[in-house]
Amino acid sequence: VRTHERVLARIEADLATGRWALGERLPAERALAEELGVSRPSVREAIRVLEAMGIVRTAVGSGPDAGATVVDRPAAGLGAAVRLHVASGTLAVRDVVETRVLLETWAAGAAAERVVAAQGTGERGADPGPGAPEVAEALAAARALLDRMDDPALAAEEFRELDASFHVLLVRLAGNPLVEAVMTGLRGAIESYVAQGSAALPSWERTAARLRAEHRAVLAAVTAGDGDRAAREVRAHIEGFYAETGL
């Protein structure tokens, strides 16, 4: 085992036992090196790995924000790893598509369930259910994204960015942080194959019009609390585009 891997294992163990909590700073490089009996370059390499994984954020200097701070960015490491594997050819586009279908059909159903739960009880929902403000905010944000995508002057690249944001938002609405992190991590790979496929379409305008309608159908099902229909709509949406592009 390389020295920096021993440092990583020790930091992982300390995080697991709660020695360092979210938002706290790790000891200074010199202090960590002395505590673990390793060189400062080994500590430095371990911190770089942790930063790439989205576990810590580093800042230079001597102020209160200097050093390595424990953060919550799980999608950072996942996204970088997935993008590199897709680029190297070790992950096929079909693998990404199938993973999307698994994640997003589940998320669509779970999001619809949250919508129903948030409606609460009593006359006209007088007693809101759990997470009602967050659910209402997410639905409003999703509608706003789709409204922006209706702009006929929108460039294809901007459309795709809004499209990706809409899908990540729906997964966030499902309320599972880990699934959201995986989906966010997949975003770069998804945008890559969508851009590649879009370039081969005979008519982007026609496809964009269909995608707009499909997005509206997915959101309508989620808003209505119909999880089964939402899952069917999102599956047809994802697989339909993949089939159309012939990737």
Residue ranges and their predicted role:
Residues A16, W20, G61, A112-V116, ...:
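Short, flexible helix-adjacent loops and helix caps
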